[in-house]
Amino acid sequence: MAKVIGIDLGTTNSCVAVMDGKDAKVIENAEGARTTPSMVAFSDDGERLVGQPAKRQAVTNPTNTLFAVKRLIGRRYEDPTVEKDKHLVPFTIVKGDNGDAWVEANGKGYSPAQISAMILQKMKETAESYLGEKVEKAVITVPAYFNDAQRQATKDAGRIAGLEVLRIINEPTAAALAYGLDKKEGKTIAVYDLGGGTFDISILEIGDGVFEVKSTNGDTFLGGEDFDMRLVEYLVGEFKRDNGIDLKNDKLALQRLKEAAEKAKIELSSSQQTEINLPFITADASGPKHLTLKLTRAKLESLVDDLVQRTIAPCKAALKDAGVTAAEIDEVVLVGGMSRMPKVQEVVKQLFGKEPHKGVNPDEVVALGAAIQAGVLQGDVKDVLLLDVTPLSLGIETLGGVFTRLIERNTTIPTKKSQTFSTAEDNQQAVTIRVSQGEREMAADNKLLGQFDLVGLPPSPRGMPQIEVTFDIDANGIVQVSAKDKGTGKEQQIRIQASGGLSDADIEKMVKDAEAHATEDKKRREAVEARNQAESLIHSTEKSLKDYGDKVSEADRTAISDAIAALKTASEATEPDADDIKAKTQTLMEVSMKLGQAIYEAQQAEGGAAAGDASAEGGDNVVDADYEEIKDDDRKKSA
């Protein structure tokens, strides 16, 4: 049975894990790292780079290197948070055909789901390389506070990547699974998850294989990226003050500043001071300019203090919704790279009145939890019951634009809820059901998930028709809504698709595009591997020809030289053809066989001569030594 993998699709880094026997195991990528940067880059010649290779070239190719795209997934172009991001990233955010926020590279638009799919493909390949078999099914994690549109877009990304997404699981819940799988006694825990782009807090009751989420809260636009940007803004301001040059419009300089800010932030988690040193950051008429600045931990903490404080209100709301006090929390589990920051740990300690638990790897625990959930679905992990909740209230718009809740936030899922409504006007023959998600009292202030019409109602006075609206949320947190006229039995239902979102046709097109890219990438990789093998063979054959060429005939030497030249031409081509390189490699191996034979015979002859000399020199000594050493008396003495 093919393995189901667990993927933590992160804003900054992603991670893949799988059940190995009874334990979940993180799989290392091709570069030997346990996490992969969530970055995709497009070079000028159209080559696509994912992960570490994309990150390595970001400084020289800032406008075509896409990062933190998860923050845009399932969001409209006009969204205020998208507006904010537009001015902070070096790449271009554009309006997609469906009104969603898309990104642009080399003049081509990509949906965030497409870019996420490229990262998922990389994770899929990492798992396939380790397992030695095809992987087609996965459990993918999302921030607990993701709304329906964002969950649907993540599922679409999996589909584009060629994966059947068996379950979308909340990141804090996944972390709790990994933390509490072997814990028998009952506990109430808080999972504080501050990652690269999102913040979640979940309160869970765990024990004896049952993981029940009591409440969840968070902010889907708060994370390490914001901390980095705050530091970048400070560096830009300091440089402008000292040199009178504004680096804000220099995309290359901004990318260098961003990398330096991230590095400094990480260093300041373990040291009190660091130095940011960026030579040749820019130039003016007087010559090149360098940025050198000492940064203390205290200064960084003062710059980001309000960001850390923003995590407190969701924590208090989650505690209130769960009906527990901070003192009743047995353990606070820290998740996400930003939770390593001493200031964050200090705030958590003050809030919950106890030292947070640091026994899990904050970068890997979510992927491990996803792998455990995959094991549960596959039947490999027994006696685990996971009860998650919907993070936001769901309802419809009623008379006067009021938001009428059908399902309250923190309701355990899967769940189904019905409520009966009626018409607002006489002889109304159709009603529009507008489905929203959020906590505000007016529907317009909440996130519109979608709308549909129930038509064909018989003319009747207002308030007479009985229209039953049913909300159905599955275990992934994805919503289906139906409306039924009780009088006529007419029914209309939709699986909620955001007013933007991707249509099935869009997804199908992107799947084909991804498959074409996968084939292209495979060809490119095969060509690189063939070229590497060819270069190695050329080097060893040239060396052998130089050392032992006199042992073969002139005709053989010429044939070998010609084969080397042909292979060099094939491997140095602008668009190398793997099959052509392999064929010419084979030819060189065949014509070199006589040379190999000559080398073998020469080495054998040398070895035989050396062995003969050694026995001639050492023969007498050996016999004498044996004769002198082996004596009965000596044996008795030694015994």
Curated annotation (Swiss-Prot):
Signal peptide: none annotated. It comes from the Bacteria. It holds the Pfam family HSP70. Residues 516-529 have a biased composition (Basic and acidic residues). Residues 516-542, 605-639 are annotated as: Disordered. Keywords: ATP-binding, Chaperone, Nucleotide-binding, Phosphoprotein, Stress response. One of its GO terms (molecular function) is unfolded protein binding. InterPro entries: ATPase_NBD (IPR043129), Chaperone_DnaK (IPR012725), Heat_shock_70_CS (IPR018181), HSP70_C_sf (IPR029048), HSP70_peptide-bd_sf (IPR029047), Hsp_70_fam (IPR013126). Residues 605-619 have a biased composition (Low complexity). The modification Phosphothreonine is found at residue 198. Induction: By stress conditions e.g. heat shock. Transmembrane segments: none annotated. Acts as a chaperone. Belongs to the heat shock protein 70 family. This is Chaperone protein DnaK. It comes from Rhizobium leguminosarum bv. trifolii (strain WSM2304).
